[in-house]
Amino acid sequence: MNKAIINDEIVIAYDVLKKSEIVENGKIKKTWRGQISTFGAAVTMGSLIPAVAFFSDQGGSSVKRQCIMDAILEILKRDHIAPEKYHTLFEYVREQGEHCREDVLNAAIVLKLAMNLYTLEKE
């Protein structure tokens, strides 16, 4: 985790969340925080590409997990880390490989931190 990057990206993450499907009427379901935490753990304990592939599908989740992947990619694009040519986070990590792991984790961390700026609600 790079604190300087986190500080720079928190404003970006707040704006990305505001424009995403994750925020509804200025509120975020607590389920989203759980999903982003699980994603971070999957990347840290496992491998980046399989974690992104898994979270790109809704599976049995009550929320559309692809929104998290979209938000992470948008943060990376706005911070000029990921080029605009990528349409999905999976495309980006597939091409960049494991060396973009820290950038993806930083974006996930800042996304979770920015969620604290919204009202959290139970399902």
What role is predicted for each listed range?
Residues 87-123:
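Amphipathic alpha-helical binding modules
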Residues 2-89:
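The feature represents the first ordered module of a protein
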